[in-house]
């Protein structure tokens, strides 16, 4: 019964962005996988729903220039296990220090390094805005801004708790 109530509340309030199947789309996270920027515990999911999240990836075009964007794109794609031009990727790796503050020195993201913001893991080949060379270049060149709205004042804590439990259950079907 609780699962069905959670599903109904999810469909009414969350499906517009995350999809009726909770698999997300470009710019909206998949809630069924295990790729979570802030953690996938029931408490963290509830906190995200209650208070929302704001994420920002800065634009690097001015700092890197066209050549630097191309090099950094190659390195980021190499981190994800893709075939790239090694010379470009090596040059990108030399510049990766400016990215390490958020993504960690190994590119595994803020969650892997207990950092307080939601910088994604660049090594898992999961891409919120697309993993094509063009999409990665656009992210580096222009940056990204993501907003998850706060639902505490809209739905109240009880309904948020039920939706949180539903999301946790669909993202952890083995538990």
Task: Describe each region flagged by the PLM.
Residues 169-175:
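Generic C-terminal helix-cap and adjacent flexible tail
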Residues 26, 32-81, 115-169:
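Extracytoplasmic electron-transfer domains, predominantly the class I c-type cytochrome c fold
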Residues 2-20, 47, 84-113, 137-142, ...:
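Sequence/structural segment immediately N-terminal to covalent heme-attachment motifs in c-type
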